Regions:
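Extracellular and organelle-lumenal recognition/adhesion modules and their flexible linkers in secreted
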Residues: 2-160
Length: 160
């Protein structure tokens, strides 16, 4: 399931692919609601950046540090007004212990997930980084006993 090769058949005014067949199941995917604030220094595990999206980490020896904010840097040609911006203030050196992850997490509610249960689906998202490379998106259930990891590639730095 290569996430970076979804054909672009145009975008709706909300920035979603125009050929989608169902309503998006990710709540606040446009990052427009940020009731807890819009800028955070020294992000702690579980801290929300915008509503429904939070900094998530697990593993031994995590020394990474981030600031997080609701940003107005968005892809051109969409009607998105906001995005999430994470700035690394202390980089993480990964050891051999495994099981370490750092990222932004959102949870799909059960009633929304039920709309796509046992069906093929597509996830589309915008990403921008000052570093090129291969990254991962992870899907997991609440019990952490079912996990799907898919890779995506950022080929060009500082572009959406």
């Amino acid at each position: 399931m290569p996430l970076n090769t979804i054909p672009n058949k145009g975008l709706t005014s909300r920035g979603y692919p125009s050929d989608r067949l169902v309503t998006p199941i990710i709540i606040n995917g446009d990052m427009s609601v940020a009731q807890r604030g819009t800028s955070f220094s020294s992000m702690s595990n579980g801290q929300f950046i915008t509503d429904r999206f939070f900094y998530d980490r697990a593993g031994l020896g995590i020394t990474a540090a981030f600031t997080g904010s609701q940003s107005t840097d968005v892809p051109t040609g969409t009607s998105f007004a906001n995005s999430i911006k994470m700035d690394v203030t202390t980089a993480q050196t990964l050891g051999s212990s495994g099981g370490t992850y750092l990222g932004v997490t959102t949870k799909v509610e059960g009633y929304n997930y039920k709309l796509i249960s046992n069906q093929k689906g597509t996830i589309s998202f915008w990403v921008k980084s000052n570093l090129t490379g291969t990254y991962s998106i992870v899907f997991r259930n609440n019990g952490n006993d079912r996990v799907l990891v898919e890779e995506y590639t950022i080929d060009s730095a500082n572009t959406w």
